């Protein structure tokens, strides 16, 4: 899998004597979680994992060289059952996903580390990551953190409709890959589909509302796309990568500085 994580930040490139010598109380380990799942006719199955590698790798490049932060290898298989029925989607159950994160967390604690951040870029994992960040704190006393997607950055120049409902293989994901891995984007195969209209607020929304309906992609988007990839440009992808990486780097630095109240 292509990655932008600097070699010097890869936990798995250390040997055990180097791990033993790390400052365990201060070191922050980051566990990326993503997916291998359909992303329409134009983006690869690995889109969420590539975006995770891209944004985290760029953020890690921005940290001071002596900041003790290492990226664990990603959990590439996520809970993607919303995308079942499309060839290529590899989904694990919620129980399996949580068990893997729990056992990696146990190994982090057993190795003597204290700080662990979960960095997730697949929406179907988000509620599980939230649960696991708390459970790892409770079960192992780890100082856990959860970090999602762009780190909260509002990407410039995205329409209100796309911002609300372009959440799968739409403009943002397409732009990020156009800038980072253009050979993996088939610009002749764009499809457009919106699950709801931002101009017509409904009582039941698909996401981010107090009252929602639970959707499967095959119910609402035959091509597998929810959003509009057509406005995506490599230039915006590069700009948004930089914006997100800066925000993620700030979050990682705050996690490094974090001290629990005595
Ligand atoms: Zn995606």
Where are the language model's segments positioned?
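Extended, histidine- and acidic-residue-enriched regions that form the cofactor-binding/catalytic faces
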Residues: 1-115, 123-262
């Amino acid at each position: 899998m292509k990655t932008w994580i600097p070699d010097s930040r890869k936990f798995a490139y250390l040997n055990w004597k180097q791990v033993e010598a790390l400052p365990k109380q201060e070191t922050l380990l980051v566990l990326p979680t993503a997916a291998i799942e359909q992303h329409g006719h134009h983006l690869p199955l690995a889109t969420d994992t590539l975006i995770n590698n891209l944004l985290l790798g760029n953020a890690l490049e921005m940290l001071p060289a002596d900041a003790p932060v290492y990226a664990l290898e990603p959990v590439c298989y996520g809970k993607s059952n919303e995308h079942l029925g499309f060839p290529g989607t590899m989904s694990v159950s919620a129980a399996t996903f949580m068990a893997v994160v729990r056992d990696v967390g146990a190994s982090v604690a057993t190795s003597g580390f204290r700080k662990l951040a979960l960095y997730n870029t697949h929406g179907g994992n988000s509620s599980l990551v939230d649960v696991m960040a708390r459970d790892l704190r409770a079960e192992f006393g780890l100082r856990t953190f959860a970090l999602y997607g762009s780190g909260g950055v509002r990407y410039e120049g995205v329409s209100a409709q796309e911002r609300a409902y372009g959440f799968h293989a739409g403009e943002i994901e397409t732009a990020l890959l156009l800038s980072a891995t253009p050979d993996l984007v088939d610009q002749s195969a764009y499809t457009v589909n919106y699950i709801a209209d931002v101009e017509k607020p409904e009582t039941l929304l698909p996401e981010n509302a107090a009252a929602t309906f639970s959707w499967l992609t095959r119910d609402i988007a035959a091509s597998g796309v929810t959003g509009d990839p057509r406005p995506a440009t490599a230039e915006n992808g590069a700009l948004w990568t930089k914006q997100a990486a800066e925000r993620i780097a700030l979050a990682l630095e705050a996690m490094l500085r974090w001290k629990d109240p005595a």
